From Swiss-Prot:
GO cellular component terms, A-Z: cytosolic small ribosomal subunit
Ribosomal protein in keyword set: yes
Ranges of biased composition (kind: Basic and acidic residues): 136-161
Classification via PANTHER family: MITOCHONDRIAL 28S RIBOSOMAL PROTEIN S6, SMALL RIBOSOMAL SUBUNIT PROTEIN BS6M
Region (Disordered): 107-161
Single Gene Ontology MF annotation: structural constituent of ribosome
Alphabetized UniProt keyword annotations: Ribonucleoprotein, Ribosomal protein, RNA-binding, rRNA-binding
Name this polypeptide is given: Small ribosomal subunit protein bS6
Taxonomy of the source species: Bacteria, Pseudomonadati, Pseudomonadota, Alphaproteobacteria, Acetobacterales
GO annotation terms (biological process): translation
One Pfam family here: Ribosomal_S6
Length: 161
């Protein structure tokens, strides 16, 4: 039998157990027709690229299936009728990887939560901008003195206001 990968996105207001129940229903349907679920991954609640049916997030589930084409059509029909499922994508594949998918392998990576890596060296940090990264013709002490004088209530000329 041909191999397929199906990814479906469930609404964000359903629980993970309900998403697992939808996947269990698919597995039961497959087993009655002689197919099998070879791989099953819950990717979690993730942000959507755009709003779908007024939802900004969704529960993602990947299923690796070994089934007849008629059974796959029935699975897609059942998922389309389910109100909790927003989107379904089924692809025919040559083989199903037993290793965790790229989505799961990146999940614990620090880049997942907004970490963009170390800041690249700018003009001043690279040593091309002058002595020690300071601006040309600029003295830190002058700014410090001017700031202190303003806080003391004195004008920058040294006179009291």
């Amino acid at each position: 039998m041909p191999l397929y990968e199906t990814v479906f996105i469930a609404r964000n207001d359903v629980s993970q157990q309900q998403v697992e129940a939808v996947a269990d229903g698919i597995a039961a349907l497959l087993e009655t027709d002689g197919g099998a679920v070879k791989k099953r991954e819950y990717w979690g609640l993730r942000s959507l690229a755009y709003r779908i049916k007024k939802n900004r997030k969704g529960h993602y589930m990947l299923l690796g299936l070994d089934a007849k084409p008629e059974t796959i059509k029935e699975i897609e029909r059942q998922l389309g009728l389910n109100e909790d499922v927003m989107r379904v994508l089924t692809l025919r594949v040559d083989e199903i990887d037993e290793a965790p998918s790229v989505i799961l392998s990146r999940k614990g990576d620090e880049r997942e939560r907004g970490f963009r890596g170390p800041k690249p060296a700018g003009r001043f940090e690279s040593g091309r901008g002058g002595a020690g990264g300071a601006r040309r013709g600029y003295d830190d002490r002058e700014e410090f003195r001017a700031r202190n004088e303003r806080e003391d209530g004195r004008d920058t000329d040294g006179e009291a206001e």
